[in-house]
Every structure is written in structure tokens, then in C-alpha cells.
């Protein structure tokens, strides 16, 4: 069977650009990643009752999940994998650290009991990443991942709608697409959950700086490649101000959680 879901070709930046972005973001990531930590905690809360002996933290970033995974599974051999060596250098919890690509895992077939990934697969060809997860999981092994859905950063799309025709966010898969791709990858007992997380910022510049600080400002084809004029920035800023709440300017994370078994 082949997937009816076309890869979002050209909508993701190159691996080199992703790596460079997260290399630059590594020093600021932890200070800016409050929502990312919250999502990681929610992902852990949904895990089934398992006792893995070998687990992978795929796209581990600075390793926030590692302390949680170590506490929960103290006897497991843990591999923390990320595309960015700079991120890996900041993983403090003792584990096996590996620089690698989620689409080409440097792991043997059927070597994992748990494939864990929080907010990393949105940078990948999801169909390929899920096939790699299936390949490396043992029979009965569990995948638990968090990704982002289509409503993510909709405020940015609103802000720039009348400014230009460039893309200002990644193209994200819907829950239905993620479910279908997981099934096509050979995964079973698929459970999809959703949550909405909203960050608030005092002004538009701070919002944009926060996106950059977590490395989420890289886009693929269709992105703006030239500097924005002052008038264009002010137009986007004015549009974003229309969305202001008493808490500040909102920025939405449309979070999708996938749990499944091989």
C-alpha cells in the first residue's frame, strides 16, 4: 500500500539549515522553551505502563526529557539523538549521545522498546521518520511522539497575510494525516490526542525573538529571503496587535500526540 498523503515537498528547510538554526539556538533554547517543556511533560503523562530496556529520545534537543526518562525507566539504556551537535553538548543527564537524522537512524533493526520524540518530527518527512521508528522498534515496542498541527503559529500567518505572499510557518500535518501515516508505516493500536498551548509576549519583536530563540524560524521554499522593510514590519506588527489579549500577544502551539505500538 502506498500513502495518499503527499510529502510536503519544499515546505521544510534543508537539513543543513535546520542544523545551523538549532546550533545557533542551543545557548538560548532552555530559557525560551517553557512550552516545549510543558508539552514534554504531557507526552510523558500519556505513556502506557511499560518497562523498556532500550529507548531512544529522537530529536532530544538539550535533553530536557532525559531526566524524566531516567527517573521513570532507571534500568533502561537511553540513547539521546539530535541533528545538532551543539544541542547534544547541552544534554546533562548521563546517556548515550548520538548526532543523527530521524530519517536515517543509526540504529539496528528491532533494537528499541520505546521510541520517544517530542517536537522534532515536524522538521522531517514524517512518513520516512515513522518508517524508521517502526524499523527500529521491537515487536510490541511503543512509539510516543509529540508534533505540531496546522493551527500552530496561525498568528504569524495572520500578521503577514497582507504583507507578502511568502510562507512564515512550516506546513504541519493534521491529526488524520498523522494517523494514516502511522498506519501505513506498520504501527498499530494508534491513539491520537491533542492539546493547545498558548504563549504570550509583550510585543511583536519579543514574539519573533522567542521563535528564533527556539530555532523555529527556519522555513523551506517560499520563505522570505530578503530583509523586511520597516513599513512591512509595521504592517505585520499592526495586524498582530489585533490579536492582543490581556495576557499579551498570543502564539499558539497546536499539539498532536501520537501513541502506537509495533
Curated annotation (Swiss-Prot):
Pathway: Cofactor biosynthesis; biotin biosynthesis
Family of the protein in this entry: Belongs to the methyltransferase superfamily.
Gene Ontology terms: biological process: biotin biosynthetic process; methylation
Organism: Dechloromonas aromatica (strain RCB)
EC numbers on record: 2.1.1.197
InterPro entries assigned to the protein according to its UniProt record, in alphabetical order: BioC, Malonyl-ACP_OMT, Methyltransf_11, SAM-dependent_MTases_sf
Keywords: Biotin biosynthesis, Methyltransferase, S-adenosyl-L-methionine, Transferase
GO molecular function, one term: carboxyl-O-methyltransferase activity
Reaction equations catalysed: malonyl-[ACP] + S-adenosyl-L-methionine = malonyl-[ACP] methyl ester + S-adenosyl-L-homocysteine
Function: Converts the free carboxyl group of a malonyl-thioester to its methyl ester by transfer of a methyl group from S-adenosyl-L-methionine (SAM). It allows to synthesize pimeloyl-ACP via the fatty acid synthetic pathway.
Pfam (any one): Methyltransf_11
Name used for this protein in its record: Malonyl-[acyl-carrier protein] O-methyltransferase
Amino acid at each position: 500500500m502506498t500513502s495518499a498523503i503527499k510529502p510536503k515537498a519544499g515546505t521544510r528547510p534543508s537539513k543543513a539549515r535546520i542544523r545551523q538554526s538549532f546550533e545557533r539556538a542551543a545557548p538560548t533554547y532552555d530559557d525560551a522553551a517553557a512550552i516545549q517543556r510543558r508539552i514534554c511533560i504531557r507526552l510523558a503523562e500519556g505513556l502506557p505502563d511499560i518497562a523498556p530496556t532500550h529507548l531512544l529520545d529522537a530529536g532530544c534537543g538539550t535533553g530536557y526529557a532525559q531526566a524524566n526518562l531516567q527517573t521513570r525507566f532507571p534500568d533502561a539504556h537511553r540513547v539521546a539523538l539530535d541533528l545538532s551537535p551543539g544541542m547534544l553538548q547541552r544534554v546533562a543527564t548521563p546517556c548515550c549521545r548520538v548526532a543523527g537524522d530521524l530519517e536515517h537512524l543509526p540504529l539496528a533493526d528491532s533494537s528499541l522498546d520505546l521510541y520517544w520524540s517530542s517536537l522534532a518530527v515536524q522538521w522531517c518527512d514524517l512518513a520516512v521518520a515513522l518508517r524508521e521508528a517502526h524499523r527500529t522498534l521491537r515487536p510490541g515496542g511503543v512509539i510516543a511522539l509529540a508534533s505540531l498541527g496546522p493551527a500552530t503559529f496561525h498568528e504569524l500567518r495572520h500578521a503577514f497575510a497582507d504583507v507578502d505572499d511568502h510562507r512564515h510557518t512550516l506546513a504541519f500535518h493534521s491529526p488524520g494525516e498523522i494517523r494514516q501515516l502511522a498506519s501505513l508505516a506498520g504501527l498499530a493500536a494508534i491513539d491520537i490526542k491533542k492539546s493547545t498551548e498558548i504563549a504570550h509576549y509583550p510585543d511583536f519583536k519579543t514574539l519573533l525573538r522567542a521563535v528564533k530563540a527556539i530555532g523555529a524560524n527556519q522555513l523551506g521554499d517560499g520563505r522570505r529571503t530578503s530583509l523586511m522593510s520597516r513599513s512591512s514590519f509595521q504592517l505585520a506588527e499592526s495586524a498582530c496587535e489585533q490579536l492582543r489579549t490581556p495576557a499579551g500577544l498570543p502564539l499558539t502551539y497546536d499539539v498532536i500526540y501520537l501513541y502506537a505500538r509495533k
